[in-house]
């Protein structure tokens, strides 16, 4: 079962999002840029749980960490903003993005610049409708150019791209978002996004959901994203954000 979802970015949301273009590093290896703003990222004290199964053990890494944030320090550099369509802030032991109108999207970035990365984060549905999308941003250059690897709270997944100021953040593939029983509906999910070379890969709970090839964007910031489709509102908690050098 599939469904098509194309989310328009309204002008009010574009104006509301706090974003900046990062120069990045175009060398063959990932490079970390200093965080934006005056806040310093605190060293997280958590230890990520080891995933179960052969694939999980293979990908469980405690070294090669480029950036991490457990969101215990509200000055670690992520946006703390309220808009007429939602908000982004540290809360509930993590980072919460709340969207309060249908057909809208909000995201946040920590102010980094990387090329090849593997990003992991825990997601928890807190409230609102499940016709949404939530996930990880990579290679974010500005509000017009980035990738978003997302799932929905009703069990769908997809990989999206914003490129050169197009009116829509479109999905790869003709089918839009695909359904998967790997995704825990209206619950907790462990997400992973690999942006390595020209390959973009989305994982949920240790299982590969989707992989696409695209060479449009080679570097940029990472981030978190939440949007609504028909849902009147949705609220997502993110915890334990880690960026690895693949």
Question: At which residue positions do the language-model features occur?
Answer:
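Flexible glycan-contacting loops in extracellular carbohydrate-active proteins
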Residues: 212-240
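Extracellular carbohydrate-recognition regions
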Residues: 48-82, 239
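Short carbohydrate-recognition loop motifs
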Residues: 85-105
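Short, aromatic/His-centered strand-loop micro-motif at the edge of beta-sheets
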Residues: 166-190
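Localized edge beta-strand/strand-to-loop motifs within extracellular or lumenal beta-rich domains
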Residues: 187-201
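Ser/Thr-rich, Proline-interspersed low-complexity disordered segments
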Residues: 12-63, 246
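Beta-strand-rich interaction surfaces with strong enrichment in secreted/lumenal proteins
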Residues: 56, 104-112, 177-183, 227-228
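Secretory/extracellular carbohydrate-interaction modules
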Residues: 99-167
């Amino acid at each position: 079962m599939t469904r098509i979802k194309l989310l328009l970015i309204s002008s009010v949301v574009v104006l509301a999002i706090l974003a900046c273009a990062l120069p990045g590093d175009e060398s063959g290896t990932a490079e970390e840029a200093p965080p934006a703003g005056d806040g310093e990222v605190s060293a997280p004290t958590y230890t990520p749980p080891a995933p179960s199964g052969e694939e999980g053990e293979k990908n469980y890494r405690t070294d090669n960490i480029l950036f991490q944030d457990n969101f215990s320090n509200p000055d670690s550099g992520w946006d703390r903003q309220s808009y007429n369509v939602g908000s982004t802030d540290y809360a509930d032991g993590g980072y919460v993005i709340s969207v309060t109108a249908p057909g809208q999207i909000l995201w946040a970035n920590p102010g980094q610049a990387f090329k090849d990365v593997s990003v992991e984060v825990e997601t928890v549905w807190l409230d609102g409708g499940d016709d949404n999308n939530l996930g990880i941003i990579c290679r974010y250059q500005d509000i017009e150019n980035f990738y978003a690897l997302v799932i929905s709270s009703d069990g769908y997944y997809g990989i999206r791209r914003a490129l050169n100021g197009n009116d829509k953040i479109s999905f790869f593939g003709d089918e839009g978002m695909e359904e998967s029983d790997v995704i825990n509906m209206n619950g907790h999910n462990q997400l992973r996004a690999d942006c390595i070379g020209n390959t973009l890969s989305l994982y949920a709970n240790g299982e590969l959901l989707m992989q696409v090839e695209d060479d449009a964007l080679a570097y940029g910031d990472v981030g978190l994203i939440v949007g609504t489709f028909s849902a009147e509102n949705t609220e997502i908690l993110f915890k334990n954000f880690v960026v690895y050098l693949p």
